[in-house]
Structure formats: C-alpha cells, structure tokens
Amino acid sequence: MGRNKKKKRDGDDRRPRLILNFDEEKRREYLTGFHKRKVERKKAAIEEIKQRLKQEQKKLREERHQEYLKMLAEREEALEEADELERLVTAKTESVQYDHPNHTVTVTTVSDLDLSGARLLGLPLPEQGDQDGSQEEEVSSMEKPTKALPKKSKDPLLSQRISSLTATLHAHSRKKVKRKHPRRAQDSTKKPPSATRTSKTQRRRRMTGKARHNGE
C-alpha cells in the first residue's frame, strides 16, 4: 500500500506555486486614483466638446458666406436688369400753354416707348384698353423688393447643435458649490419657560421663610 501511494505521488503533475507580493505603493495609488482619473476624463470630455463646437461654428460661417455671395449675385443681376430697362424706356414730355384773361391752362403730353409694341420683351401686342395696365406692370417689375441678407443659417440643426454644445460646455466648466443647510434656530424648538414654574432653590427659600414665621 505504501509503495502504491509513493508511485501515485511521484506520477502526479504538481502545479507551480503562486507567489503573491503585496505592494503598498500600488495599493495606495489605486485607492487614491479614482478622483484623479475622474478629473482626467472630465478634461478629455471638455476638450472634445470644444473641438466639436469649433467645427460646427466653422461650418455655420461657411454656409452664411455662401448665402451672402448668392444674395450679392442676385442683387447685381437685378440692378443690371433695371439699368437695361431704364436705357430702353425713353419718355418725351410736351407742354403747351394757353393764356386766358382770367387763368392760364397748361396741357402736358407724355409719350413712353412701348417695349411690348417694339417686340423688345417678347410679349404680344396689347390692345389700346390694356396699355395702362401694361405700363403699371412694367413699373412694378422695375420696382422689385430687395431681399434682406440672411441673418441665420438655413439649417436649424446647426444652431441647435451649437446651442446644445455650449450648454454642455458651461455645465461641465461650472464649479459645484456646496451649500450648507442653515441650522435651525434653537429658540423656535425650545418652549419658553413658564412664568409660574419655580426652581428648587426658590421653593426651599419659601419653605424656610414660612417655618421661621411660624416659630416666631
């Protein structure tokens, strides 16, 4: 029996021993490093938010610049069309005065060049009754309202992203101030002493005074 046990022990594969070394410095660094790692993560998050905010602002500026250039080109084109129409339209004014013994009468005749009649605008010939309407349409076409420059971007998502990023940045950068709760006044909790209540010394003095009075 003893030989068999020795053979079994010799045949078993023994596992290598594990040696654990306790390092006090690493333990202290691990336990006290939670706050440090938290501050580092907070700084990294703030830097990332700043980078994203810069990218969104740059994109917004580029879009506004493109819109401004487009609006400027439209205005220049409208001014060129107005100048061309002003060159084509010629007006002649003739005034004739008639003197009377009591008053003076002046007759003014204004004749404008009809662009539609000269086939300059490519419109059909108007009738005599519609000449006044065509003149009003020409005047209204010349006086086109100018568009205002875009103050905001057409994409509302960019402005929303920028506002949300700035809000989160302010929330991260703001320091938390711990407010201490005011202590409750002790006067409000304590009941005022009653006027009729007397202390032990006062009662003893009263009893001794009565005893002396009775002895006399």
UniProtKB/Swiss-Prot annotation:
Gene: Nol12
Biological role stated in the UniProt entry: Multifunctional RNA binding protein that plays a role in RNA metabolism and DNA maintenance. Participates in the resolution of DNA stress and the maintenance of genome integrity by localizing to sites of DNA insults. Also plays a role in proper nucleolar organization by limiting nucleolar size and regulating nucleolar number. Mechanistically, regulates the nucleolar levels of fibrillarin and nucleolin, two key players in pre-rRNA processing and ribosome assembly.
Keywords linked to the UniProt accession: Coiled coil, Cytoplasm, Nucleus, RNA-binding, rRNA-binding
Record protein name field: Nucleolar protein 12
Residue span of region Disordered: 120-216
UniProt feature, compositional bias: Acidic residues: 129-140
Coiled coil, from the record: 33-97
GO CC terms: cytoplasm; nucleolus
